[in-house]
UniProtKB/Swiss-Prot annotation:
(6S)-5-formyl-5,6,7,8-tetrahydrofolate binds at residues 27, 90, 129, 464. GTP binds at residues 232-237, 251-257, 276-279. Homodimer. Heterotetramer of two MnmE and two MnmG subunits. Belongs to the TRAFAC class TrmE-Era-EngA-EngB-Septin-like GTPase superfamily. TrmE GTPase family. The lineage of its organism: Bacteria, Pseudomonadati, Spirochaetota, Spirochaetia, Spirochaetales. Mg(2+) binds at residues 236, 257. This is tRNA modification GTPase MnmE. One of its GO terms (molecular function) is GTP binding. Keywords: Cytoplasm, GTP-binding, Hydrolase, Magnesium, Metal-binding, Nucleotide-binding, Potassium, tRNA processing. Residues 222-384 form the TrmE-type G domain. One of its GO terms (cellular component) is cytosol.
Amino acid sequence: MSNLFQREDDIVALATPLLSSALCVIRSSGISSIEKFSKMFSDPKRLLEASGHTIHYGYLIDKEICEKLDEVVVCIYRAPKSFTGQNSIEVMAHGSPIGIKRIIGCFLKVGFRMAEPGEFTLRAFLAGKLDLTKAEAVNELISAKTNKTHSLAVNKLSGSLFAKIDLIKKDILNFLSALSVHLDYETSEYEVAIPFEIISKSRDELKRLVDSYNTARKLDYGIALVLAGSVNVGKSSLFNLLLKEDRAIVSSYAGTTRDYIQASFEFDGILFNVFDTAGLRETTDFVEQLGIVKSNSLIKEASLVLYVIDLSARLTNDDLKFIDSYKGHSKVIFVLNKMDLEPNRQTVEFFNSGNINSSNLVKISTKTLFGIDSLYDKIRSLTCFDYIDIDAYDVIVSSSRQAELLKKAYTLIIELLNKIEKDISYDMLAFDVYEVLNFLGEITGEVTSEDVLNNMFKNFCLGK
């Protein structure tokens, strides 16, 4: 059996990163955790007599070698009024990596074991402190990469997804109750009305939750934004501008970027994975050729392409080839850069002649920042509102486990509606309804197995 289910063990873990910092937090939980910890505290009697939700100042002491390890503040929690439902201790110590390791070592000496990933949250779930949707929201909150994903995780932590699932379950239970009454009294002279419309409503609610998972994946993985163009047109300058930091080398030498550089930035709550690619041109340099091949591959796979053109120079053959291939493509924005320089007459005439729809053009200068706001507006119009419709959902499902169970419940509901149309016997309908409720119960954790919990909580970080 996994250590995750050894609830009688006293566990300890570092809840903050193992880095040099002003403070760190070490947390522990278990039936005997306070008694064991008191053996390494400077005033053990005070801790043993302490009430829950109290804070105590003192020193941690390795009594085997009679040496003080650190000056600390200790928070005491008494069962059942703690995150895990057990006696728990949180130690705030100085963030010295060496000191932290010595303190953890002292915990182990007095009888604690290292916690498994997610074990504190699992104990909270097993103690009925939170359901599985909230437990998964804890992990989503910790790993959130943007303001939007953080807000969605907080909403789920406050119970929004559980409330939605619970509402669907109550509707289906009402249907099942009516079905059961009908089966009990089908030979009676009384006719029991069965609210079949409830199943149609539940189907629609489940469909919205299933669809929301696709939106969640886009939020989690981000939008692939590729900067492409000929050499020395300002792609790397634009890359640095989007990131608001100098990540790419900017040089007047053509071919400085010989392979792609990837980084991420947040815009309007959406994560963008931006790629600064090698300039497109004919070259005999083998390494640069490989970079150009990769550039073309990234362009094809991208959600959005910013094709950068030097407005002060003549269009290259590679520019013309790209324009011919992508001039009507909705995922491409043609960025006319270097507006701060004298424009090339032929290049200006080419774009003024209507070869490209003006709605796909943005004029900028990475040097003076001219037109940058217009570029952001264009990115927003092509991605945030069209590509990811966040506001269409009151609750968004982010977990693949939840999504899979919702798909199963939705499929069964569809089958149930088909059976209703075919006048299948009510006892057969009841069997399918129980199956739907079972899948929904697995989402919240009312119906689950040890294997499911092991698989879910192993993806949590240590100390959570």
